[in-house]
UniProtKB/Swiss-Prot annotation:
Segments forming domain SAM-dependent MTase PRMT-type: 30-377, 380-704
Function: Essential arginine methyltransferase that can both catalyze the formation of omega-N monomethylarginine (MMA) and symmetrical dimethylarginine (sDMA). Specifically mediates the symmetrical dimethylation of arginine residues in the small nuclear ribonucleoproteins SmD1 and SmD3.
Enzyme Commission code(s) on record: 2.1.1.-
Organism domain of life: Eukaryota
Species assigned in the record: Culex quinquefasciatus
Cited Pfam families: PrmA (PF06325), PRMT_C (PF22528)
Name by which UniProt lists this protein: Protein arginine N-methyltransferase 7
């Protein structure tokens, strides 16, 4: 079945992640069966809940299981019963583990009704009826304790997974504080027992390129655009910047310090679970550089003694990395992928207040760390630093990946070189798209005039700031093309788009939207207008993902429990809502090419897009077809009709994928399209078809 590409956007990596996972505290929906848009969103969220990798995280599952056995065994050895409460049970996995470990009673609560109903089916399928696990379909804060109520008695063991990349972003502090006061006995044991947050001071120009727009210049070194000071000084978005730090090129950052622990959370101690804290840690500088950011991660001590440790550290700081490297028998796996993989808990980047000061080896500085109920932030020698928020508007208008695109040196070089060749002082340029700094920079090339078509207020305000700061008198901003009179429209010689639109999710959607707008405005423009880009194409390559495919893999059995009921629920809702091509930042997910890239389609942008068109073909898997678990898809825009690489902007691989021996190097400023293959092709052939619908402005993909 062909379905429309996903319009939800998924996890934006450079912005925020909102995956629903199997054992988290989920949003309550009042109308699970609605056919409205909210009903569609609900079905999609159910579908995505198992597409997170939670139950495929074997280390996480095994260490929760070990901690339950140790904790329950500890109580029994002391002659005490073990009464377990599982908050946010999700699939019911942790509750079933608790029963298997010998718990005397288990109460599970789950507020998300469709998931709670599914957990009930999972428990029954594994032989755990209401006499073994009492399932309460409520939020933990609504649970009542007492004879004849939700819980007959308070629990003395709490097992839960309330964490996200930022540790406390899902409300762990408030949930634990409530449970400790109302649902748990004094002196109770919690699984996990405690958490530690770590920070590492770094200089990382790559990360900064996702935070601050650089000065824009041409090949001759002429400065075309400078960045307004309020944008440079702004601390940026308050949204967590969750990243697979292990996939950062080692040459892309300079570790100025060793990792240091900055916060500890003892989950069984209500008094120590403060909503707001500040810590000051002296840090010794081990390498010189400018302090630009902090890399953050955390670990969990799963049991009271701390004998079971679950770490979310990147590979260079992971406690098991050395032993895993020594025991590795597969030389094709990059060493940064030897540590256990997970996508539900990653690491995060926090930007420090802007400075040009360089730290030197041996210097000691104070790292200030802060947290409130939901978030973290960091500073240097800044004991009164307020929480991060955008004060300039730029980081609200544009995502981090968009800022990365604006700073893409190769993209800017090719675009400006071409624009300088075809434009002159008589040119009048209409720029279509959101937040095009290249469009603003055209004004500095000496053209007659530039009109920026910016319907969105936020983006329009940001572009106005750039125009004022750079003193560009020949650049005007329009909210609607109707603001131009007939003589002004008649003077337009070129229409330019990067193309970029904030509403686009998959790369080619930018080009399609540009083409659709061109079709609308063409009748009011001079007949000999030049349109840039000239055309766009979509390409794909069959790949082997090392890990990404796990987000779409069926659960089957997990730690000896049958979770097929979960699989059936997920599949049912996925068939209704999910697209065969989803957006993912593939630089974070290593993949190997298993064949030669194919061009799936090509469409003109200098002419009207067709009403409909169909393309068909097949991939020949030249290497290890049995390993094929995905198709990676990307778009290229072509500024002219020459087909030259020098006039092509690509959102895909940075170099040839021909050898297949090394992971593909992806453009880190774009999310590419991904189709996850459920079953590897036996004959080494994957058939594909793409249908373009001009009226709906969409491409429909099918892979067989």
């Amino acid at each position: 079945m062909m379905t429309k590409p996903n319009q939800r956007g998924g996890r934006q990596k450079s912005d925020t992640q909102n995956n629903l996972v199997l054992n988290c505290k989920m949003k309550m929906y009042d109308d699970a069966g609605s056919d409205s848009d909210d009903g569609f969103d609900l079905r999609q969220e159910i579908a995505r809940s198992a597409f997170a990798d939670m139950c495929h995280d074997w280390e996480r599952n095994q260490k929760y299981d070990q901690a339950l056995q140790l904790t329950i065994g500890r109580l029994h050895a002391a002659g005490r019963e073990a009464h377990v409460l599982d908050i946010g049970t999700g699939s019911g996995l942790l509750s079933m583990m608790a029963v298997r470990a010998g718990a005397d009673s288990v109460v599970a609560c789950e507020a998300f009704r469709p998931m709670a109903d599914c957990a009930e089916r999972v428990m029954a399928a594994n032989g755990f009826g209401a006499d073994r696990i009492r399932l309460i379909k409520k939020r933990s804060t609504e649970v009542r304790v007492g004879p004849g109520l939700d819980m007959e008695r308070k629990a003395n063991v709490l097992v839960t997974e309330l964490f996200d990349t930022e540790l406390i972003g899902e409300g762990a502090i408030a949930t634990y504080r409530h449970a400790l006061e109302h649902l748990l006995e004094p002196g109770c044991l919690t699984i996990p027992h405690s958490a530690t947050v770590y920070a590492q001071l770094v200089e990382c120009p790559l990360a900064v390129s996702w935070q601050v727009p650089k000065i824009l210049g041409n090949a001759d070194g002429d400065v075309l655009l400078r960045t307004p000071e309020d944008v440079v000084d702004c601390r940026g978005s308050s949204a967590v910047f969750d990243v697979q730090l292990s996939q950062l090129p080692e040459t892309s950052f300079n570790a100025l310090s060793e990792p240091v622990s900055v916060f500890g959370f003892e989950w069984s101690n209500r008094e120590e679970l403060e909503v707001k804290r500040h810590s000051k840690k002296p840090v010794e500088i081990i390498r010189g550089g400018i302090p630009q950011a902090v890399f953050m991660w955390w670990d969990l001590k799963m049991d009271l003694e701390g004998s079971v440790l679950l770490s979310c550290a990147p590979f260079w700081a992971h406690p098991d990395f050395s032993s895993l490297k020594e025991s590795n028998k597969n030389p094709t796996i990059p060493e940064q992928n030897l540590i256990p993989w997970r996508d539900h808990w990653m690491q995060a980047i926090y930007f420090l207040p802007y400075t040009k000061n360089t730290l030197i080896p041996g210097q000691r500085v104070n790292l200030d760390s802060f947290h409130d109920e939901f978030s973290l932030w960091f500073g240097l020698e800044s004991p009164n630093l307020p929480p991060t928020h955008c004060s300039c508007g730029f980081h609200i208008a544009y995502s981090r990946s968009r800022i990365g695109q604006l700073n893409d040196g190769l993209r800017n070089k090719r675009s400006l070189n071409y624009l300088e060749q075809i434009l002159d002082k008589s040119s009048t340029v209409l720029v279509i798209g959101d937040g095009s700094l290249l469009g603003v920079a055209i004004g500095a090339l000496g053209v007659s005039h530039v009109y920026l078509l910016e319907p969105g207020q936020l983006s329009r305000t940001c572009m106005e700031s750039y125009i004022r700061f750079n003193g560009l008198k020949n650049v005007s901003i329009l909210s609607d093309l109707a603001e131009l009179d007939a003589s002004q429209r008649a003077a337009i010689s070129h229409v330019y788009g990067e193309p970029y639109f904030g509403s686009a999710i998959l790369p080619w959607e930018n080009a399609i939207q540009f083409g659709a707008l061109v079709k609308q405005i063409r009748p009011v423009l001079p007949p000999k207008v030049t349109f840039i880009p000239h055309s766009f194409s979509v390409h794909a390559v069959p790949v082997e993902f090392l890990d990404l495919h796990k987000i779409n893999a069926p659960l089957g059995t997990c730690e000896g429990f049958d979770l097929s009921a979960m699989d059936r629920m997920i599949e049912e809702h996925s068939n209704e809502t999910d697209s065969p091509v989803e957006a993912q930042p593939l630089w974070e997910y290593p993949s190997f090419a298993l064949g030669t890239p194919s061009k799936l389609l090509s469409l003109p942008l200098s002419q009207d897009l067709p009403e409909t068109q169909l393309w068909q073909g097949e991939f020949q898997l030249t290497q290890n077809p049995e390993k094929c678990n995905g198709i990676a898809v990307w778009a290229d825009w072509h500024m002219d009709g020459s087909g030259s690489p020098k006039t092509t902007i690509s959102t895909g691989p940075l170099e040839s994928t021909a050898d297949g021996e090394q992971p593909i190097r992806w453009n880190a400023n774009w999310r590419q399209g991904v189709h996850l293959v459920k079953k590897a092709p036996r004959d080494g052939v994957v058939k594909w078809s793409v249908k373009f619908n001009g009226q709906l402005r969409a491409c429909y993909f099918q892979f067989e």
